[in-house]
Every structure is written in structure tokens, then in C-alpha cells.
């Protein structure tokens, strides 16, 4: 077997087409590139399988499956559609070589000269030789026949691709390698021929692998083109294999070119059929139009020949209008149809003659001459029809005018007379008031005048009916019947009018009598009703009294009211008698009117009901007044009981307040003696609490009884409560002040004599004796004690004794100031010096030093309130004791 050395290349030459001579980039470089070899192996395998599957087989390994020559021969038979010589079935090497040679001989018979490709290399599985052989087959059977504008093979296929993809953005096909790397070219080919399979607008040029895979998947699924390329190989190879791409793209050409050829053949057939169908359509259209036109003529002629006169003007006018519509609307389109029918007939005959078709022969009776004859008969029937219509209309016009005049007058009279009989038959006066009856009588007089005015119209109606009978009006029977009904009704209206007048006059006299009785009733019932309403209001009036005298006055007034009841009852009976007389008259003459009084809104039932109500309220009022009298007696007892206690408690509280005040300002004796005296006062006050509680109980009873005044005492419970609470507050405050004075005296080293002197000075300048000095009193006090004060110094002292700026100085503030002025006190500097000792002369102190030197609670107090130290030499956790000490004495903003 001959081996192909690395530098050896195979060649193939077509006898008839020199463009197939090998090229350097197609043979030498391609077969030496492993990447290209991989692409060719996959593409050629897929291409072979796309044809072998038609024979129910396929290959897996291109260099192995063609070694025995059997599938190679089968591939050529499927591609060419021709039968090759019968293969050898042996499995020996020479059998395989013989089969491969048969295949190569067949290729050579198609005008392809195989150079350097021998059967032995194929049988030995030489990959490069096998790929070269398959490429030769692809060129001959898949690419050679491609021709676009006299170009062939590769150039033709490239030109076809360029034209198909020219309209697409980002697609520029210049070769069969790099121009296809982004996949948009394949997608554009599919979209150009099958836009339903792919949405080109959604493709992304930056996704070449996705584009290639999408195109191959759609081609495999919808175009029956198997996947022949590997998207990653195409994208990742600088220059993809040209043969592989040409092979795959040629499949698109054959898939779409076959469809175009079929479309061309179908268009040719459709064109021929369209001409024939158009001729048939014109024939059918002629037959249809001719039939419709002849049918219209057949229906119209009898209508035009009909001269039967109508009985009414409207019917004749309808005939005239129909004829005018015929001339204006119906006939012109038919004239156009007749003309168009002749044109269509001539056009059809011309088309048939040009297209070598036999002449058109309409069905029997539908020739152009038949249509012309029918049209002539139509125009003959049309003559004179309009003149006959106008004469008949003039004849009916006079009769119709009289008939319309009769109808108008009859309708006017009937409209006027409608409901008149029912009105005259009404007995509405039987249930009407006098005013309403008088109005009905005046209304009836107006009707009688109207009735007389309509006499002329009735006579005119009868005269017109007579004339229509003489003119032999077609509807004379109905006219006579209507006229007779009008005359009969007229006679009845005259009779009913006279009877109604008599009834109205009789009813008027009866109602005048009733009206006088109603007026008398109204004059007497209204005052009596007002009296009863006032009485009921007084009897139900809610009285509010606060003394026995007030309730006694109400009882006296009620007794006086009861004395007037017999006289009122007599008036009530007189009023009821008037109403009874009214009802007697109504029943005697069967007058169906309401017994209600038009002059009064007061009814008999209302009078009876209110009188009964008055009689019921009198004893109820008696009982309420007596109960209130008893309640006022009980309230008076409560007032006296409360007053007795309040008049004793009030002065007692006042006395105790005065005793405490005197004790608080005394300047003799020791503070301890003063404290003992105040404690005794406090004990006595607490023991007096039972009297306050008892008074509270009596006050609760008074409140429950709704007693709001008490003339027996000037003390109210609120006064007692305020005095008692003030007493408790005063004794507690006074005791606290003495305790504070003792504490201050002991803490500051003040002697009792000094304390007494301070008290004497404060009491002297406490001009209002309320335990407070204002600014001027305080200044005078200081001056009396030897202080020579300027404004600035006095202002400083005031901030000490009146820190809240209330404008007053208490005794305790005065004592604190005087003790600071006379005693030895600690200062912020002393406290800072003490903290500096604990901190070992550092400007800051640590928390552990505070916990070590101070009690736990005081150490925690300092740690919580001391600010952090941020001065020189600061360490983490350093605390500023200087700022803290200044804050203790009000010398800092902390």
C-alpha cells in the first residue's frame, strides 16, 4: 500500500471546469491543520449521513466506515440517483479495494480526474485521503451545479450568499471562513427564506456561539439540514475550515433553491390557471348579470302595465313616487348593467380569441339580442304610465280634500267632546265644600257657553258628510257612521248639561247652612282649645323649688285652677252640640262631604281627648305637689343639721391656723420647745379628723337631695375642705421649717440667740405677715443688719436667695444666706484639693481610684457624673474632677 508522506497532496481535476484545480490554501495548508481536519471530519460525516439516511444507514467514523467501499458506493447511488456496478461481498482486502475502485471509477466517469487518491489509501483508512475523496464528491454533486449569473461553484455559492444576506445588519459575507464566525450569516439565510422560523431583530452579534447553535438547531428541525459544524470550533478557530463551511452552506442553497424552483413551476401553472379562471369568471359573471337583468325586466313590465286606480290620494302619490324612484334609482343602474354586459361579452370573446380558446356561447335566451328585445318591451310599457298617474291624482285630489276637511273638523269636535259626558255625569258636588260647589257652578256656566259655541261646527260636519256622499267617496260608510255618532253625542250633552245645573244649585243651598254652623264652631272651639293646651302645659310643667314657701305658692295656684273646671265643662258641651247639628244635616240630605271644619283645625275628637287629658292631669299634679312639699321639709332638716356642725368646725380651724402662725414667728425660747409645741398642735389636729368625716357624710346627704343653698351657715363643704387641707399643710410646713432651722443651727454653729435675732429681723420686714419678703423688704432687712450693698452685689445675693426668680425670699432662704455669711463653709477649691490628693497630684482621676478611696455608692455617683478628662496627659478612662467640683457649687455649666 502506498503511504502519503506529510508533504504529499492529492489533486482532482475536472475535464470541463478548470476552476476546480487545487489551490494552495485549499490543499496544502488545510490538510496540515488539525483544527481544520477536525472540522472537516465532523462536517463531511454529517453531510454523508444526510444522504445515507435516505437508504436507512449512516456512518460513525468516516475513515473506517468507507474502507470496505460498500457505504461509499451506496452514498454515490443516493446522491446521483444512478445504479453503480454490483459490489463484491467478500471481506478480503482485494474485495474492499475492488469496491472502492468501482466508486472511484464512477466519480471519474462524471468528469473528475482523481490525482494521488488510490483505493489502497481509502481501504487503509487514510484520513486525509478519505476527506479529500469526500470533498471531491461534495464539489461534484453539491457545489458544481450552483450557478448565479454565469458564475460557478465557489464563486456562485458565495454570490448567492451575499445577495441573500445583503439587507441584514452586521452581516458581510466575503469568504467561507471568517465571514461566518458570528453566526449571523447563517441566521440571515434562514430568515431571508423562512422569516417565521427566526426573529433576527433579537440576535446579538456578541453571542456567536448562541447564534450558530440557534441556526443549526432551526435548520435541523425545520429544513432537514443536519448539524455539520461545531459552534465552539468555528468561533475559537482564527480561520475556520473553508470546505466545512462551504459544505454546510451548500445544504442551505439546495434546500432553498429547490423551493424556489418549485415556486417558479407553481407560478407558471398558476398563471395559466389564472387566465382560464378569469375567463370562466367572466362567463359566469355574464350569465349572472344577464339572468338578473332579464328577471328584473320580467318583473317590471307587469308593474308598468297596471292601470288600476287607487282609492286614496296617498296610494296614488305612492305610485307616482315609486315610478319616479324607478326612473331615478332603479332604471339607471340597469341601463349601466345592460351596457356593461355588452362590454363584458365583447371583452370575453377577445380574450378567448387571443388565448386560443373557443368562443363563448351564452345559454339559450341570454344572447345580447335577447336582452335588447326585452329592453325594448320594457320601454314600450313605460310610455304613458306617468301621464295616467298624474290624471288620477288630480281626480282624487278634490275628494281627498273634502275627506281631510271632514276628518279635521270631526277630530277637533271629538277631542273637545272627549270626556265631557263623564264630567257631566259626575256627582262630585255631593262630596264638595261650599267653596268647591260654587266653583263647580261657575265652571258649569263656562261650559254652557262653550257648548253653544260648538253648535256651528256640528252643523258644518253634517254638511261635509252630505257632500262626500254625493261625490261617491269610497269611504262614505265610515264618514256617515262617524257623523251620526257626533250628532247623537251632541244631543246627549245638551240633556246632561241641564240636569247638572239643577243639581249644583240645590247642593249650594244645603252647604251654605253647614258653613254657618262650621263658622260658629270655629269661633268658640279655638279659644277653648287654647285654654286646654295652656292648662295641660301648666299641669305638666316641671317645677323646681328650693324652699317650703315656693311649693306652698304652687299648691295655692293649683287649687284656684281646679275651681274653674265646671265653667269650662259647660263651654265644652256647647261646642260639641254645634258639631252634632252639622252631622245631622249631612245625614238628613245624604251629602257625601267630610264633616271636617274648613275654618278650624280643632276637631271634636281633639277637644274630647284634651279634656280627658286635663281631668287626668289634675290629680297627678296634686300628688306631685304634695310629694315635693314633703321633700322640702326633709331638705330643711338636712340644712340645719349641716349648719350646726359647719358653724363649729370653721371657727376651730381658723383658731388653729392663728395659733400655728403665732408659734412660727415667736422669737423667745429654744427651737426644740417650739418643735414640741407644734407636734402637740399636729396631734390635736389629727384627732379632730373624725368631725370632718362626719360633716362630709352630712354633705353627701345634702348633695344627694340636690340642696344647693343653706341660709343657716356661711360655711360650705368646699370652704371646710380647703381650710382643713390648709391647716394640715401649714402645720407640716411649720414643723419642717423648725426642723430645718435646728439642722442649720447645728450644722453651721449658729447660737440660739443668733437664730432668734434672724427671726426677729425677718418678722419685722415681713410686712404682709405671710412668711415672705419681697426684694425691697429684703434690701431693707440687710441694710438694718449692717450690709452696705451696691446694685451688683444685691443682684448677686438675690440669685442666691431667689434662684427661681419668683420675686420673694422665704425665711429658710434668709437663714441659709445669713449662715453662709457668719459660718465657716467648704468651697469648690477645697473639694478640688481633696480630689487632687486622692489622684496623687494628677489633673485627672481614674474610676478604680474613686472605688478604692470612697464608699461604693458615692464612688459610683462620682463616676456617673464626672465628665471625661481631655487635657494634657490624658489616659483612657480619665475623669475631670475639677469640672465636677465646680459643678457642685454652681461654678460650671455642667
UniProtKB/Swiss-Prot annotation:
Mainly resides where?
A: cytoplasm
Domain EF-hand intervals? 753-788, 789-824
InterPro entries according to UniProt: Actinin_actin-bd_CS, CH_dom, CH_dom_sf, EF-hand-dom_pair, EF-hand_Ca_insen, EF_hand_dom, Spectrin/alpha-actinin, Spectrin_repeat
Looking at the UniProt record for this protein, which Gene Ontology cellular component terms does it annotate, in alphabetical order?
cell junction; cell projection; cortical actin cytoskeleton; filopodium; focal adhesion; plasma membrane; Z disc
Its lineage reads: Eukaryota, Metazoa, Chordata, Craniata, Vertebrata
Q: What is the gene called?
A: ACTN2
What this protein is called in its record is Alpha-actinin-2
Record-annotated disulphide pairs: none
Superkingdom of this protein's organism:
Eukaryota
Amino acid at each position: 500500500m502506498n503511504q502519503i508522506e506529510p508533504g504529499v497532496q492529492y489533486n482532482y481535476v475536472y475535464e470541463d471546469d478548470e476552476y476546480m484545480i487545487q489551490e494552495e490554501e485549499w490543499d496544502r495548508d488545510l490538510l496540515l491543520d488539525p483544527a481544520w481536519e477536525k472540522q472537516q471530519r465532523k462536517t463531511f460525516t454529517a453531510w454523508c449521513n444526510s444522504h445515507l439516511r435516505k437508504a436507512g444507514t449512516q456512518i460513525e467514523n468516516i475513515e473506517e466506515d468507507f474502507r470496505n467501499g460498500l457505504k461509499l458506493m451506496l452514498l454515490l447511488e443516493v446522491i446521483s440517483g444512478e445504479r453503480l456496478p454490483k459490489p463484491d461481498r467478500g471481506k478480503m482486502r482485494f474485495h474492499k479495494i475492488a469496491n472502492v475502485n468501482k466508486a472511484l471509477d464512477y466519480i471519474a466517469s462524471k468528469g473528475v480526474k482523481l490525482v494521488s487518491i488510490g483505493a489502497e489509501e481509502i481501504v487503509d483508512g487514510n484520513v486525509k485521503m478519505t476527506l479529500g475523496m469526500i470533498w471531491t464528491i461534495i464539489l461534484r454533486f453539491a457545489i458544481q451545479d450552483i450557478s448565479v449569473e454565469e458564475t460557478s461553484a465557489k464563486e456562485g455559492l458565495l454570490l448567492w450568499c451575499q445577495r441573500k444576506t445583503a439587507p441584514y445588519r452586521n452581516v458581510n459575507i466575503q469568504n467561507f471562513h471568517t465571514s461566518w464566525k458570528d453566526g449571523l450569516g447563517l441566521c440571515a439565510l434562514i430568515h431571508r427564506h423562512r422569516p417565521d422560523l427566526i426573529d433576527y431583530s433579537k440576535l446579538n452579534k456578541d453571542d456567536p456561539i448562541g447564534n450558530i447553535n440557534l441556526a443549526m438547531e432551526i435548520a435541523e428541525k425545520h429544513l432537514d439540514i443536519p448539524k455539520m459544524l461545531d459552534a465552539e470550533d468555528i468561533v475559537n478557530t482564527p480561520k475556520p475550515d473553508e470546505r466545512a463551511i462551504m459544505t454546510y452552506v451548500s445544504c442551505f442553497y439546495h434546500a432553498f433553491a429547490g423551493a424556489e424552483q418549485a415556486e417558479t413551476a407553481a407560478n407558471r401553472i398558476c398563471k395559466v390557471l389564472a387566465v382560464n379562471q378569469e375567463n370562466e369568471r367572466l362567463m359566469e359573471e355574464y350569465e349572472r348579470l344577464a339572468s338578473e337583468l332579464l328577471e328584473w325586466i320580467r318583473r317590471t313590465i307587469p308593474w308598468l302595465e297596471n292601470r288600476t286606480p287607487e282609492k286614496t290620494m296617498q296610494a296614488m302619490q305612492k305610485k307616482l313616487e315609486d315610478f319616479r324612484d324607478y326612473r331615478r334609482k332603479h332604471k339607471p343602474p340597469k341601463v349601466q348593467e345592460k351596457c356593461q354586459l355588452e362590454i363584458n361579452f365583447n371583452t370575453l370573446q377577445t380574450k378567448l380569441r387571443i388565448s386560443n380558446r373557443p368562443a363563448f356561447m351564452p345559454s339559450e335566451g341570454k344572447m345580447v339580442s335577447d336582452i335588447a328585445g326585452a329592453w325594448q318591451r320594457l320601454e314600450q310599457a313605460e310610455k304613458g304610465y306617468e301621464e295616467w298617474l298624474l290624471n288620477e291624482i288630480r281626480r282624487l285630489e278634490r275628494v281627498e280634500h273634502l275627506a281631510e276637511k271632514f276628518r279635521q273638523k270631526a277630530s277637533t269636535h271629538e277631542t273637545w267632546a272627549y270626556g265631557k259626558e263623564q264630567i257631566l255625569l259626575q256627582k262630585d258636588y255631593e262630596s264638595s265644600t261650599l267653596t268647591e260647589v260654587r266653583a263647580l257652578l261657575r265652571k258649569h256656566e263656562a261650559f254652557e257657553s262653550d257648548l253653544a259655541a260648538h253648535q256651528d261646527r256640528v252643523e258644518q260636519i253634517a254638511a261635509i258628510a252630505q257632500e262626500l256622499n254625493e261625490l261617491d267617496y269610497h269611504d262614505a260608510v265610515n264618514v256617515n257612521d262617524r257623523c251620526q255618532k257626533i250628532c247623537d253625542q251632541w244631543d246627549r250633552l245638551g240633556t246632561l248639561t241641564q240636569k247638572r245645573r239643577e243639581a249644583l244649585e240645590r247642593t249650594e243651598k244645603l252647604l251654605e247652612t253647614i258653613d254657618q254652623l262650621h263658622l260658629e264652631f270655629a269661633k268658640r272651639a279655638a279659644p277653648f282649645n287654647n285654654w286646654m293646651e295652656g292648662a295641660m302645659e301648666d299641669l305638666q310643667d316641671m317645677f323646681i323649688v328650693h324652699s317650703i314657701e315656693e311649693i306652698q305658692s304652687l299648691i295655692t295656684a293649683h287649687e284656684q285652677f281646679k275651681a274653674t273646671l265646671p265653667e269650662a265643662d259647660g263651654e265644652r258641651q256647647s261646642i260639641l252640640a254645634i258639631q252634632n247639628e252639622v252631622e245631622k244635616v249631612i245625614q238628613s240630605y245624604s251629602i257625601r262631604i267630610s264633616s271636617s271644619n274648613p275654618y278650624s283645625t280643632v276637631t271634636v275628637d281633639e277637644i274630647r281627648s284634651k279634656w280627658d287629658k286635663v281631668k287626668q292631669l289634675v290629680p297627678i299634679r296634686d300628688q306631685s305637689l304634695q310629694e315635693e312639699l314633703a321633700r322640702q321639709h326633709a331638705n330643711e332638716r338636712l340644712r340645719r343639721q349641716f349648719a350646726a356642725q359647719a358653724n363649729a368646725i370653721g371657727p376651730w380651724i381658723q383658731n388653729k391656723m392663728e395659733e400655728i402662725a403665732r408659734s412660727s414667728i415667736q422669737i423667745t425660747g429654744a427651737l426644740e420647745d417650739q418643735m414640741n409645741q407644734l407636734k402637740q398642735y399636729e396631734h390635736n389636729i389629727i384627732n379632730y379628723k373624725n368631725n370632718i368625716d362626719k360633716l362630709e357624710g352630712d354633705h353627701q346627704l345634702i348633695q344627694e337631695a340636690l340642696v344647693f343653698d343653706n341660709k343657716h351657715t356661711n360655711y360650705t363643704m368646699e370652704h371646710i375642705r380647703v381650710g382643713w387641707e390648709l391647716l394640715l399643710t401649714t402645720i407640716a410646713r411649720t414643723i419642717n421649717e423648725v426642723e430645718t432651722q435646728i439642722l442649720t443651727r447645728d450644722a453651721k454653729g449658729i447660737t440660739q440667740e443668733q437664730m432668734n435675732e434672724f427671726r426677729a429681723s425677718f418678722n419685722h420686714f415681713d410686712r404682709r405677715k405671710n412668711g415672705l419678703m419681697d426684694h425691697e423688704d429684703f434690701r431693707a432687712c440687710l441694710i438694718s443688719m449692717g450690709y452696705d450693698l451696691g446694685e451688683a452685689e444685691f443682684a448677686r445675693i438675690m440669685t442666691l436667695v431667689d434662684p427661681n426668680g419668683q420675686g420673694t425670699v422665704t425665711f429658710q432662704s434668709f437663714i441659709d444666706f445669713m449662715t453662709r455669711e457668719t459660718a465657716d463653709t467648704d468651697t469648690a477649691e477645697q473639694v478640688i484639693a481633696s480630689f487632687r490628693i486622692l489622684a496623687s497630684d494628677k489633673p485627672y482621676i481614674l474610676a478604680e481610684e474613686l472605688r478604692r478611696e470612697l464608699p461604693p455608692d458615692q464612688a459610683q455617683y462620682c463616676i456617673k457624673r464626672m465628665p471625661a478628662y481631655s487635657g494634657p496627659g490624658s489616659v483612657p478612662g480619665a475623669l475631670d474632677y475639677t469640672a465636677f467640683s465646680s459643678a457642685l457649687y454652681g461654678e460650671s455649666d455642667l
